[in-house]
Amino acid sequence: RGVRVSCETAPHYLLLCDEDLQEDGRFKMNPPLRSREDRAALIAGVADGTIEVIATDHAPHTAEEKSRGLAGSAMGIVGLECAFPLMYKYMVLPGTLTLEKLVALMSDNPRRIFGLGGGLNVGGEADFTVLALGAQYEIDPAAFLSKGRATPFAGWPVQGRAVLTVVGGREAYRDDGLQL
């Protein structure tokens, strides 16, 4: 029929399964976490190109909205601040994905699929992020810039941190505390 179809997943579906669930609003997301076998199928789909995008699924909620346990909390978790470092540490460094493939999944492919400009084209308004790939730290929700702090990854060791983001040719974010 000529219908264009794409497929995405998010870091929490690649790194967690239903065995990881806790009675805590930080674990309430839609769709919910599935089985270990489902998680393995998603990883295979990312590796073989069936899944073209890893999105953040960023759904920030206040502490109040996420404090009502698994059943009563608002749906969704934050993902923006921890998506890249999680994927780099747990998918690239072990060899499941290359860094180039991760960049395509998180940046190039979404831009292409949605027909967005940006990137690094001569004469265009640059969109890019500079990453400190050697930066190792633990995910600390208190350090998030988003209004949401609800992440099932609190305390997880990660690697790779955004130190500069340029959007439309203008600096949008700079981490002045990290040496390049």
Would you name each region that the model predicts?
Residues K28-D38, A74-V78, T151-V158:
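A short acidic, glycine-rich active-site loop
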Residues P11, P60, A135:
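Short, glycine/acidic-enriched loop or turn micro-motifs at the edges of active sites
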Residues R1-I54:
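Histidine/acidic residue-rich metal-binding segments in metalloenzymes
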Residues D38-L42, L116-G118, T151:
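A generic local structural motif
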